């Protein structure tokens, strides 16, 4: 009787180990094939705590000796992509930025926040929203992401145009001013803020999303993650390799500070 019981337990344990191994392999295969890639666009801007100065010739904003940081709306986009990865819905987070060598600091910040790798498109020129959208379009066609995230606008020019132009150039569904994101199967539900309240959109993937302030609160980056970010890959490319002409059709005539308001009497 004891031998029969022991033999029965042996077969049960053997069967369980086989089943456990099967499900572990299946889950591992699912994690490799199913999760998606997110491409996050970030921009380096004058820190929001710095008072903006105008050049003496009124040709542009004077950023010399100014603290530069990641655009706050783009920081929210990075945070959301990292959170989606932590929930197992995304397998890779790629960040991309356009600018001079100083933009590398912004990319390292995004990598320290949890992004996996970065793409740096080198240029010294100031670009219009359309050129930026065309550039990100070329990157998107190479990377083939499932979700493209970017801030709804940059705080330096407040154009609020790149996301919309990008979606149009790629012919992809879009949601702007997003305050909530839910992913299920091969579709995405986005809640966006409109003048009358909230609007819920169901989008097929891939899709373009621009983030609002209410989507999340970016995490504080720890020192160990800052150190790890230095070892993550940053690929540098130029406009020639993308086949894009960065010359602008727009010319800035003059930049002035807002006119001072006259004191009122209450």
Task: State where each predicted segment sits.
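Cationic, amphipathic, low-complexity alpha-helical segments enriched
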Residues: 1-2, 6, 12
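Short, Lys/Arg-enriched N-terminal segments with co-localized hydrophobic residues
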Residues: 3, 20-35
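Intrinsically disordered, low-complexity segments enriched in small/polar residues
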Residues: 6-9, 19, 31, 262
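Tryptophan (W) side chains
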Residues: 10-11, 16, 23
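N-terminal glycine-rich FAD/FM-binding segment characteristic of electron-transfer flavoproteins
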Residues: 31-266
């Amino acid at each position: 009787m004891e031998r029969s019981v022991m033999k029965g337990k042996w077969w049960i344990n053997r069967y369980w180990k086989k089943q456990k191994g099967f499900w572990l392999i299946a889950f591992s295969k699912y994690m490799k094939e199913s999760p998606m890639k997110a491409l996050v666009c970030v921009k380096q801007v004058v820190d929001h705590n710095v008072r903006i100065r105008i050049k003496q010739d009124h040709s542009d904003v004077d950023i010399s000796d100014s603290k530069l940081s990641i655009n706050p709306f783009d920081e929210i986009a990075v945070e959301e992509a990292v959170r989606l990865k932590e929930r197992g819905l995304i397998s890779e987070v790629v960040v991309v930025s356009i600018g001079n060598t100083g933009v590398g600091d912004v990319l390292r910040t995004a990598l320290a926040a949890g992004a996996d790798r970065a793409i740096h498109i080198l240029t010294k020129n100031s670009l219009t929203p359309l050129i930026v959208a065309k550039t990100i379009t070329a990157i998107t066609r190479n990377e083939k992401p499932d979700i493209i995230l970017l801030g709804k606008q940059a705080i330096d020019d407040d154009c609020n145009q790149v996301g919309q132009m990008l979606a149009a150039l790629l012919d992809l569904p879009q949601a702007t001013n997003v305050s909530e994101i839910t992913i299920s199967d091969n579709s995405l539900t986005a809640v966006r803020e409109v003048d009358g309240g909230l609007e819920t959109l169901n989008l097929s993937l891939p899709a373009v999303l621009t983030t609002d302030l209410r989507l999340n609160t970016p995490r504080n980056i720890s020192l160990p993650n800052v150190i790890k970010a230095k070892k993550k890959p940053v690929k540098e490319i130029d406009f020639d390799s993308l086949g894009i002409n960065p010359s602008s059709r727009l010319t800035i005539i003059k930049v002035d500070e807002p006119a001072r308001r006259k004191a009122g009497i209450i």
